Amino acid sequence: MKGFRLVRIGLAFFCLCGFLLSGCGSGIPMRETIGSAGTESDLAQTTAMTDTETEVRTDQPIRAKGAAYLYGETEQDAISYRVGELIRFHIRLTDTADFRLTYPCAKLVWHAEADDGQNWNGTDSGDSGRLTLAFSMKAPGSIRVTVEACDRDGEKLGEVQPFVGGAICGFEQIRTGTECPKDFDVFWQTQLGELDDVPPEVLYIDPADSPNPNFRAYSVGIRSHDAEAPVTGYLTIPKNAKAGSLKIRMFFYGYNASFSPSPQCADGCMTFAVNAHSMENGREKGYYADLQNGALKHYGFEAEDYRDPSGSYFRNMILRDVQALRFLKAMKEWNGKEILLFGGSMGGFQATAVAALEPGVTELSVFIVWMCDVSGRSIGRLAGWLPDYTENLNCFDSVFFAARVTCPTVITQAGLIDYTATPTGMAAYYNALRGKKQITFVQSADHGLSPIRRVTYSESQEGGKR
């Protein structure tokens, strides 16, 4: 079934989660004017508005009722563009207190860069408070555009939040920068073989404070492949749950070592909040701070971690995650049918790996998944916070795990300016999934943060790899 796309516009708030077009191929952005008599100062006299909003112009200096910011969006669905098609960004200077207002400024200074290696810079008049920029890309991938309000000397106006936005072209064609290693499955079957010899025995299960009076909570330790690094986390079970009555629900956290997971409760589920690092649960803050600043500082980023991937930090983390699920599958309360995995950022990486490696997962829900397209930078794509690329890092690419996931998957958020979980990486992840799937991209959303005004673009497919 052909995927659909949906655009929604609405107010949003900052929230933590865990964690262009060249002028017809010339490499020069097109300058667009309105009407046959338009001049360069007439740039972008139109922009997308909600049904009830009407443009209100003011010629006074910026005296915002709320906070002044540059708002922007693409003329079309931001993930629908084809390679070579013009991607138009409409930007205007407005106000958090009244979106109808448009403010002038002296100059609008902008920069754009794309996965295909193109870069653009420019300065335009801000007299109208509006700007349209149009670019084209030469290959599938993403583009990032930054626009700043400046004074007549080109200095940034500190009271105005810049616009940073993005778009994707050739969405359906996007794949990882390199192919999946031919021995990917052999590697992981070998690692899982180490777990097969270690039953998930309970080392301790101590009562813990429950956030819900209808649930029992436990701090749990489970034997795993490394006797010195057991599985740890919090388990919650509804009171008076009968044998065979509950779904399994697992929750994985983002990149951090400064805190312990907390008990999570969901009706009809036994929920395990996984501690990624085999740390003790519920210790004092100093215990976690010492680990964050010591043994676990920069974990997973050490080059020696990938000289032999069978000894890497993330390999051991994933094996503990799989062992945690094996423990839950052995519990009498499980209904034997439903397994739900949740996680964002590094938690999304873990959840995807478990869904790929352990049979029986029935639903995967993730957001801003980390470790997607780890080789992207090596072919010139825009990339951000990832370990330095080596071929062995491919053993941990979330996209290659996604290609082995067959259950329904919902990607609740991907940011169009997120260069920790890059837009291109998230597109490759979505394209690799083999089951029913849906993804929602958020314009101007960075890693774990939503913009002042939220615009989303969604794609879904009933099933089958693209």
Regions found by a protein language model. Name each.
Residues 427-466:
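C-terminal catalytic histidine-bearing segment of alpha/beta-hydrolase fold enzymes
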Residues 200-241:
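N-terminal cap/lid segment of alpha/beta-hydrolase-fold proteins
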Residues 22-23:
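C-terminal motif of bacterial Sec signal peptides marking the signal peptidase cleavage site
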Residues 323-381:
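Primarily recognizes the serine-hydrolase "nucleophile elbow" in alpha/beta-hydrolase
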Residues 380-432:
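The feature captures the conserved acid-bearing segment of alpha/beta-hydrolase catalytic domains
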Residues 51-215:
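N-terminal targeting or regulatory segments adjacent to alpha/beta-hydrolase or S9 domains
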Residues 258-319, 376-377:
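Cap/lid segment of the alpha/beta-hydrolase catalytic domain
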